[in-house]
Amino acid sequence: MRLLLALLGVLLSVPGPPVLSLEASEEVELEPCLAPSLEQQEQELTVALGQPVRLCCGRAERGGHWYKEGSRLAPAGRVRGWRGRLEIASFLPEDAGRYLCLARGSMIVLQNLTLITGDSLTSSNDDEDPKSHRDPSNRHSYPQQAPYWTHPQRMEKKLHAVPAGNTVKFRCPAAGNPTPTIRWLKDGQAFHGENRIGGIRLRHQHWSLVMESVVPSDRGTYTCLVENAVGSIRYNYLLDVLERSPHRPILQAGLPANTTAVVGSDVELLCKVYSDAQPHIQWLKHIVINGSSFGADGFPYVQVLKTADINSSEVEVLYLRNVSAEDAGEYTCLAGNSIGLSYQSAWLTVLPEEDPTWTAAAPEARYTDIILYASGSLALAVLLLLAGLYRGQALHGRHPRPPATVQKLSRFPLARQFSLESGSSGKSSSSLVRGVRLSSSGPALLAGLVSLDLPLDPLWEFPRDRLVLGKPLGEGCFGQVVRAEAFGMDPARPDQASTVAVKMLKDNASDKDLADLVSEMEVMKLIGRHKNIINLLGVCTQEGPLYVIVECAAKGNLREFLRARRPPGPDLSPDGPRSSEGPLSFPVLVSCAYQVARGMQYLESRKCIHRDLAARNVLVTEDNVMKIADFGLARGVHHIDYYKKTSNGRLPVKWMAPEALFDRVYTHQSDVWSFGILLWEIFTLGGSPYPGIPVEELFSLLREGHRMDRPPHCPPELYGLMRECWHAAPSQRPTFKQLVEALDKVLLAVSEEYLDLRLTFGPYSPSGGDASSTCSSSDSVFSHDPLPLGSSSFPFGSGVQT
């Protein structure tokens, strides 16, 4: 060590180094890393204040150690030496000095240089050319070189043809001395992405251009122009964006294939599905009922073995473990999307296990065995047939219904098969789809409600006689909700009544409605409890209709809560009773948004996608606690009528993200888009999004990148948050965790003195009026500058991880 320090002292005392005076650029960088040299000449580099520095010596894996003024640099910090690299985040005056790089385990000098302080990058003295003041002898000791491609093999793919919605990345990795710069052109014109929906990402250190969610208007010739003082080079990429053509799923020919297996073996049936829109996939097994595989109408009886929809994992492979003779038969892979259905079938043949003694026996013994086996099998079959007929008659007298797991499908509709699987009950699953005929014609999937014997779940079952039903609160998608008094909901106080809400089916409900209500009940069991969601309190499943008991929100949904508390204004036309509580304060509005974000963050952590987040689906308790409702609904997203209003007059499409609207893709990030619309509802005090905009026109406006304008009196920071939620690229939207953090900062920054909306907002003029408004698309509801908008003050935007 002493020898090393002594050597450093000698090296640092050598006078008269040649000078390297570099212009202020994005980064001081020597690329590629230099190989070890025994005679590395000392040099000087002039670095502008605030300029990042990255120097390297040796190969990346075995680079040398960096020293400054005899002290070895640590691998972390603002100035660090790491894997042969010297990195300075932002050059400061104290960073000037002598730097050495020595090879690992030897005294070989890889780099010997002095960094001196130059002018600041922010200097505005542009009257003189700094090159004119440099002495020619102070040039870089390395020869100048025109730009050249460092990885031409990565640029061989000249034509990029991709479907709309994909991400495209063009790379032009280059080097030269001095370090070249890169510019991008589209069809011969400078390209900065300012007019492109979603913008672009320029990664200069990677020499790349990235465009997410490409559309047909992105077609063209993209040119990377790399240049320095010595020369320039360019390369052209051709981009063709293929429009999405509506088509039903395409199944690969020959799959699934006919398969033969031996009893006890494992079988895999493969079904390769190609679909632009998100497909539903089902595996079906054809079965026999009463000796027939088909019903009177000619459609087959099938059993649903495996199903996947938008939120399920891939099911293109059907696994059959330890097959038996009963597994033999016909299997069908059924795939469907919003356009139509496709299916292909295959046969599975199951052979008995081979007996090794069978092949070694003499021919005479074989014939004897055949006769014995045949006689015994025939006798056994007769006995089983008689026993089956007797048992069938006995069961027919008690339960005149076909087996519960059997369906007879008409034209293979995409019917769901629900199971009672609760993490809390621990009971085995039982099918909820009885043996009835399903028809794909008409909105009512099944006519006539049947009763199902649901298993008792002791953790959730509530005595029916301790529930007193009250007046109706409203109607949902498939049932009604009534207010009720539950006695003994708290076991410690058996005689105390608690106000609850009870979900039940309407009189004209169908089998599908019952399955949906049971599905919602099971989802709520699995989701668990949180302060900002409607929690399940109990269920009544025995000896009567199904009741799902949930928390009651006394102040109704958030939209009506906001509208009832609007300050008076000449243009206000209230559609409900005015609240006596008076106008809401600004911190209360932010708190509403914060609570909803917390509830959605919890649902996201439980892998639950809401798909219909809006102010109408957020309920408000007596203590002004926001609770997200209807997160457990089983929505048929592939059969949404985009031009049909809901029962309360709202158009669901106005809350839907573009990828959900156009491609039926629902994710947590599409819920984030809906949260941005909900924010707009909050700060317009219950306004209707896109007032007066026809649905057909809304589609084209969203495609062009138009977004709603900032509501009156909404702070720019919160409007910036809305615009972040409405980013065209789902991956660039914030997560709910980030939204919670951002809104929490807003709450902390708000003064303790509440701001009266009478003073802050002034007389209310509902720019977000009712859907009956007659304003045109040219009104101020839209901001006509495409995304991305001006910067938001929140710490996310580009590069958000989902």
Swiss-Prot record:
It catalyses: L-tyrosyl-[protein] + ATP = O-phospho-L-tyrosyl-[protein] + ADP + H(+). It comes from the Eukaryota. Residues 391-802 are cytoplasmic. The active site is at 612 (proton acceptor). It is a single-pass type I membrane protein. Keywords: ATP-binding, Cell membrane, Disulfide bond, Endoplasmic reticulum, Endosome, Glycoprotein, Immunoglobulin domain, Kinase, Membrane, Nucleotide-binding, Phosphoprotein, Receptor, Repeat, Secreted, Signal, Transferase, Transmembrane, Transmembrane helix, Tyrosine-protein kinase, Ubl conjugation. Residues 119-148 are annotated as: Disordered. Glycans are attached at residues 112, 258, 290, 311, 322. Changing residue 772 to N: In a lung neuroendocrine carcinoma sample; somatic mutation. Disulfide bonds join 57-101, 172-224, 271-333. Monomer. Homodimer after ligand binding. Interacts with FGF1, FGF2, FGF4, FGF6, FGF8, FGF9, FGF16, FGF17, FGF18, FGF19, FGF21 and FGF23 (in vitro). Binding affinity for FGF family members is enhanced by interactions between FGFs and heparan sulfate proteoglycans. Interacts with KLB; this strongly increases the affinity for FGF19 and FGF23. Affinity for FGF19 is strongly increased by KLB and sulfated glycosaminoglycans. This is Fibroblast growth factor receptor 4. It comes from Homo sapiens (Human). The lineage of its organism: Eukaryota, Metazoa, Chordata, Craniata, Vertebrata. The gene is FGFR4.
